[in-house]
């Protein structure tokens, strides 16, 4: 079940949960903080230079030590510019490094999760966890942290200077600070809620837009453009309304902050002016106080805004941690990892060769998000080299069988044996490295034909690639492409037809030279002529390999060593094609019905 967006209360805003990532850059972060403190100290002292210039050079009408004053001012300015450059560079680099680490950690963890996680969480949600949440966390541990350090220390230094210059005048200004904090917090709380709502609406609009593009063919053929368009316009109108609300609060907010700054300035001018007229304060001192009174509000606003944003960012932190701490439904035991390694650190020297014997022993199975048993007390022995075809209606349990063989899911009860040993006694990577899997809906990765085929065998030569293509009668796909193996297939193989993508998927699986081959309705998307060519290749390729073929077209499995007819998670018929046809049972009905439909289609 997809996690809900909700307010989450974590100690210290959840920051301790992400400190392990920041600790990798602790010395850089310490240096950034020190430079931020120095920069805020210098910034708070600039008005003091103006005070000295007005009181000394203007007030006393003298130019002595002016050269030293200018040199000192320029020197400090140059040092600060250099430190600011280094600080900004390091903060940016730290943000990018943290984003990279957070995204790599989350993406790598996703590779280790079972299919159940992806069934329960949509792509947009997972994408937001990897990209958006990690980006917010990286920003928090870099720019937002430096905002608090610089602005917080600047406020402290300014308040110290104000008290040192005139504690009475400082107290009059400080009286406004609690009111300013209350007003800023009041508006910020509402702005955070509105901005959170805007982000949710933006995610919905992005999702709708994506569906509008990917589902363009279905939208046009079902003539539902107006329905989809109305829904999209409703979402954008809602977002406009909420955004206008946020803009209204933003306008009130900045107007109020400006008013508070003006009140502080008025107090300083009123009281400071009286002190200056009565020769109790110099004009330069009044000038520096006015600068401080005006300048303290923006840093105060920034600190409160950052602290307020922590309430929102802690949701990002919690969701990110939920992802990286999600345990896979299918996981190798510590003992297996110790011997065979894990997904990213395999110990191939300990891998035994896979022969291909497969057996189900008293297997019960239900999906993690389901209540009903798909398989109950299921038993099956498949000697190595056997070609097993599985047929049955939708939901009968065909794909469940091969999913358990591939260990995409674990049995609820019982065992799946590979070469006589429980599949859980060896690593998932060991098993997957010996399985070739071709799906009904083929998937190609962005890149060239060569790149895609080498996912089956990274060290494959062009000769090996062409041999695999020849086995599945797919050389024509390459020959008609301008750049041959170097031709780009487009995103998801979008530049190829479904049949062409399927042929390349076959070649990729065969190139891996698997001991177990799984074809999950793999010829369902191929036209009849292509099917005949590839069927001849499959008959050749599966020799000597254990193969499981889930058949959509029963004509493709007539040569199978054994055909299993599955209904409600149980094998109701078993035998060769000729044996099952003689029985005139359920398989006979399926085959006869499909044959009659094929004849009708041919005549039509």
Regions found by a protein language model. Give the residues of each.
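Membrane-integrated ABC transporters
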Residues: 1-43, 58-69, 87-91, 95, ...
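Transmembrane helices of ABC transporter permease
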Residues: 24, 28-41, 69, 73-79, ...
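An intracellular "coupling" helix at the cytosolic face of ABC transporter transmembrane type-1 domains
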Residues: 19, 23, 27, 115-116, ...
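Alpha-helical segments in transporter systems
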Residues: 16, 27-48, 52, 69, ...
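Helix-loop-helix
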Residues: 61-68, 161-175, 245, 249-319, ...
């Amino acid at each position: 079940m997809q996690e809900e967006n909700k307010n989450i209360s974590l100690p210290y805003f959840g920051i301790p949960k992400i400190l392990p990532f920041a600790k990798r850059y602790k010395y850089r972060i310490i240096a950034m903080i020190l430079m931020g403190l120095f920069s805020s100290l210098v910034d708070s002292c600039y008005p003091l230079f103006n005070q000295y210039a007005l009181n000394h050079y203007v007030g006393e009408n003298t130019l002595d030590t002016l050269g030293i004053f200018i040199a000192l001012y320029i020197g400090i300015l140059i040092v600060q510019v250099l430190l600011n450059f280094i600080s900004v560079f390091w903060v940016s680099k730290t943000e990018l490094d943290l984003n990279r680490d957070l995204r790599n950690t989350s993406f790598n963890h996703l590779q280790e999760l079972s299919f159940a996680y992806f069934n329960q969480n949509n792509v947009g949600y997972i994408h937001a966890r990897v990209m958006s949440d990690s980006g917010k966390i990286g920003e928090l541990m870099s720019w937002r942290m430096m905002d608090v350090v610089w602005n917080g220390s600047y406020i402290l230094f300014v308040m110290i200077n104000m008290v040192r210059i005139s504690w009475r005048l400082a107290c009059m200004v400080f009286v406004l600070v609690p009111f300013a904090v209350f007003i800023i917090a009041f508006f910020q709380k509402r702005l955070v809620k509105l901005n959170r709502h805007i982000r949710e609406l933006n995610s919905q609009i992005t999702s709708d837009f994506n569906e509008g593009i990917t589902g363009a063919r279905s939208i046009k053929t079902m003539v539902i453009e107006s329905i989809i368009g109305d829904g999209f316009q409703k979402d954008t109108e809602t977002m406009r309304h909420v955004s206008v609300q946020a803009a209204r609060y933003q306008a009130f907010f900045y107007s109020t902050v400006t008013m508070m700054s003006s009140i502080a300035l008025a107090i300083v001018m009123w009281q400071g002016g009286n002190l200056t007229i009565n020769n109790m304060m110099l004009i330069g001192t009044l000038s520096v106080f006015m600068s401080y009174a005006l300048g303290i509000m923006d840093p105060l606003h920034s600190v409160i805004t950052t602290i307020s944003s922590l309430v929102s960012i802690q949701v990002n932190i919690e969701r990110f941690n939920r992802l990286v701490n999600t345990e896979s439904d299918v996981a190798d035991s510590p003992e297996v990892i110790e011997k065979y390694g894990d997904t990213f650190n395999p110990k191939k020297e300990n891998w035994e060769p896979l022969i291909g014997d497969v057996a189900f022993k008293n297997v019960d199975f239900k999906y993690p998000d389901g209540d009903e048993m798909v398989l109950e007390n299921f038993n099956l022995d498949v000697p190595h080299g056997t070609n097993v075809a599985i047929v049955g209606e939708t939901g009968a349990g065909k794909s469940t069988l091969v999913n358990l063989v591939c260990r995409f899911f674990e049995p609820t009860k019982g065992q799946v044996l590979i070469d006589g040993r429980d599949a859980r006694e060896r690593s998932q990577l060991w098993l997957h490295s010996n399985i070739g899997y071709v799906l009904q809906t083929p998937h190609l990765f962005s890149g060239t034909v060569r790149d895609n085929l080498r996912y089956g065998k990274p060290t494959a030569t062009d000769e090996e690639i062409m041999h695999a293509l020849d086995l599945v009668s797919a050389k024509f796909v390459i020959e008609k492409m301008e750049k041959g193996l170097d031709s780009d297939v487009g995103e998801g193989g979008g530049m190829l037809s479904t049949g062409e993508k399927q042929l390349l998927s076959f070649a990729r699986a065969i190139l891996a030279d698997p001991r177990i081959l799984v074809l999950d309705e793999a010829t369902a998307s191929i036209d009849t002529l292509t099917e005949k060519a590839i069927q001849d290749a499959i008959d050749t390729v599966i020799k000597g390999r254990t193969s499981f073929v889930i058949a959509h077209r029963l004509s493709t499995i007539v040569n199978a060593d054994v055909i299993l007819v599955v209904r409600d998670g149980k094998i109701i018929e078993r035998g060769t094609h000729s044996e099952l046809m003689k029985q005139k049972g359920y398989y006979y009905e399926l085959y006869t019905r499909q044959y009659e439909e094929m004849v009708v289609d041919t005549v039509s």
